[in-house]
Each structure stands twice: as structure tokens, then as C-alpha cells.
Amino acid sequence: MSNYTLKFYIIKSILSKKIPFLILLSFLIGNCSTSKTKQLNSSEYKLLLSSEKFDDPLTGFKNYWKIVKTVAKNHGIKVIEKEQTFDLKHKEISFFDTENLALRKAGFLIRQKVKYKKGQKKPGFEYGVKYRRTDPANALAVDLILHDGYTPKDETIELESDVVYFSRNNGSAETTYSVSNSTLLDEAPEMRLGSFADIYPALGKLGIPETAPLTKVAGVSADEWMVVPGKLDFGDGLFGRVDMTVWIIPTRDGELRIP
């Protein structure tokens, strides 16, 4: 059975108070093993939304969920709503790179996630590495399988496409392809390239010194608030889970918080 994941990301810009909002649609075509697959098994479609729609995240979630349900009804798609429709989940999201962003320039990113429970950070860390390119064959050229002794969070090293639409630019679109792999750790590694190369051998082949320190990109972390209000039934065993997420991060003018 295939799965369809619909995600809504609202991302606050680091550099200004003009906050872009990102709606992300992910289509999971199928499953694969822990080995790398050449099949495109995930596609994400992204649209920019107005920040004014989400001054209050929960209100924005509820209003946008109404829109999703209306559109689904108009297209004959059944909506399966969760009993706890707007149960908020909270995480801290951080990205790490070298001082001169050597990983980004090489097409890589390192992401750290820490979960919260009742306002307190839970023990443990989730680390993910993603490699992105504009051509799927180039994305598949990198092997993100973990070193012996580390266990992947998922059984899949996914090839996915990200499609970003620019409605103000003659409706043009930009597509990138990526592979990614994540693992759960009890302790955070030492923040240098070599520590992560010990987990992801591919990072040790970039020509970046193993001693190169890794720091948070832009020096900030994002507070992520997410709800999973339900899923869509497209028929023939095809279901879509809907995630709606707000990221809140500091800006040049101080930290902006959504009430």
C-alpha cells in the first residue's frame, strides 16, 4: 500500500520580519529497504503563503484545515479526521555546517531534532543528513548508509523530489532531488566534521578537514509546533497524512514569537 503525506510548514525568516510561509506536499510512492533505491518514492510540492494567515498558529491550523477539507470534498476525497485533531507536538530544529558553509556548498545538510514533552526537552537526539541535487542521478551518486554500529531511524533511504512553485514569477517551478538518512542517538556527537563522518562515511569523502568545527547555521534553532489533524482517503488503498507545522526562529530584530 502506498502512502501520501501532506505537510504544511510555516517558516519564519531569519533575516527579516517579512515571514515567508511554506506549504509542503509529500507524496510517498512506495517502500524500500535500508539499501539505496533508484525509485522516486517521495515528492514534495511547496507553495509560499502569507504570514498574516498564521499570526496565531492554532487559529491558522484550524482555518487551513477547513480549507483542506473543503477542497477534498469538492474533489470527492474522503477526509478521516483524528479524534485529537489539533494535538500540538513540539520540537527544536537545528542545522549545522562549517563556518564557510562547506557542507551546503557540497549539497549536504545536517539536521538535529530534539523533542519536547510538557515544555521540557526529552533525552536523546535525532540526526539526519540530506544530499540535494537538481538531477536525480546526481543525488543517487552519494551513499548515505550509516557506519556499522549505528541504526537508521527508518528502513528507507529515500529518493525524493522537492518542487517549489513561484506563483509571482509566471508560475515557474524549481525541482531538486535528494536522498536522506536519519539516526537516533542518546548523546550529541562532538560538533566537528569527523564525528559525523564516523556516522555517515560519505561526509568523510568531501575533502573537508575532520577537525573542522560545526556550528548552528545562522546561530539559531527553530521551535517547531506541529499538528496532525487527519488523513485523506484517495481510494484504492492510497491514504494521505496531513501534517501542519509552524517554525519560530529568532530574527535580526530579536526573537519573534507567535502567540
For the regions a protein language model found, what residue spans apply to each?
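Bacterial N-terminal signal peptides that target proteins for export
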Residues: 6-20
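Bacterial N-terminal signal peptides
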Residues: 20-28
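Phosphate-end processing signature that detects enzymes handling 5′-triphosphorylated RNA
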Residues: 35-259
